[in-house]
Amino acid sequence: MILFYFMQTPLYYVHKHLKAKFTNFAGWTMPLQYTSIIEEVRAVRXRAGVFDISHMGRLLIEDPEKKLQYFTTNNLDKLSVGKVQYNLLPNEKGGIKDDVTVYMLSEIEFFLCVNAANRQKVINWLSPHLKLRDLSGELVQIALQGPKSEEIISKFYPVSDLKYYRFKVFDKTIISRTGYTGEDGFEIYVSPEEGKELFLELVKLAKPCGLGARDVLRIEAGLPLYGNELSEEITPIEVNLEKFVDFSKEFIGKEAMLKKKVKKKLFGLELTEKGIPRKGYRVFKGDREIGWISSGTYSPTLNKGIALCFVDIEERKEGNEVEIEVRGRRVRGVLRKYPFVRTPAGRYQK
């Protein structure tokens, strides 16, 4: 008999107290929802929501010789102390080992936030070449997202002057103006003890939200998820992330990335009939299969089914009428550019 053990974040019993419903994700037991996914999505869009995202990996890297530059697609020379950069860790084939955010703590110190499922893979990939310390167990990570997030976080920390993709350090706490929802927001890295207290204070002012709402929000915002839109086989070019790849510098897999013949690229899809698109559903133009869905959901904001999908390059046209196959039947839709939801804080995107 094989037993599977799922890890719990330091806030697990806080979530139990708040009557969260749990799910297993990337080896972790995480809140899926507290009330309903729809309510939580609407709370973030209209006011603010708070998420425990402590399952993410947090790595500290010392890099006096600037070796990290070769392991990233974006140019670390564009960073300065106090800035955050969205980045990709490429493999030898030009695919993606992980997508990460890089915080420049000092001229030689970098703090990386990596995906939960890829934490050990990234450690194994980088540690033979760089001095690396895994801080994942020493910090909790809380995301406060929504148009009222600045007003709320300012009750606890003086960060109202913080620009997007910037961060401040308060003792051992890091606060960045970053997020994964398309809304304005902050991510807080803090000790487990302080994190429990902070989370309980934040849920008095913002709605606690689970991974269900987080996934809907990121699809509405057109943001990729590793394992769906990103993988070791998919290049940044195929997911329209070229702006995060500096081809003027050297990095692992650069030549392979440029040589790969791209036949399909990521695009958006909205259903014009009732239905919910899901990962793996096929996309058709007439009788011809032109692609597949990588992520799909019902959008409470738009009141319709939406999806991210890989489709033939020549079919990537706004308003192109298509169909998806849902349990043996065809459902009509149209191709759309993403993000699907454009908020006043639309600049708050990766």
Curated annotation (Swiss-Prot):
Enzyme class, UniProt record, top EC level: transferase
SUPFAM superfamilies: Aminomethyltransferase beta-barrel domain (SSF101790), Folate-binding domain (SSF103025)
EC number: 2.1.2.10
Pfam families according to UniProt: GCV_T (PF01571), GCV_T_C (PF08669)
Catalyzed reactions per annotation: N(6)-[(R)-S(8)-aminomethyldihydrolipoyl]-L-lysyl-[protein] + (6S)-5,6,7,8-tetrahydrofolate = N(6)-[(R)-dihydrolipoyl]-L-lysyl-[protein] + (6R)-5,10-methylene-5,6,7,8-tetrahydrofolate + NH4(+)
Swiss-Prot/TrEMBL GO biological process terms: glycine decarboxylation via glycine cleavage system
UniProt keyword Glycoprotein present: no
Record has Cell division as a keyword: no
Annotated Gene Ontology cellular component terms: cytosol; glycine cleavage complex
GO molecular function, one term: transaminase activity
Keywords: Aminotransferase, Transferase
Disulfide bridge positions per record: none
Family: Belongs to the GcvT family.
Quaternary organization: The glycine cleavage system is composed of four proteins: P, T, L and H.
Matches recorded under HAMAP family: GcvT (MF_00259)
Chain's role: The glycine cleavage system catalyzes the degradation of glycine.
Name this protein carries in UniProt: Aminomethyltransferase
Organism name: Aquifex aeolicus (strain VF5)
Phylogenetic classification of the source organism: Bacteria, Pseudomonadati, Aquificota, Aquificia, Aquificales
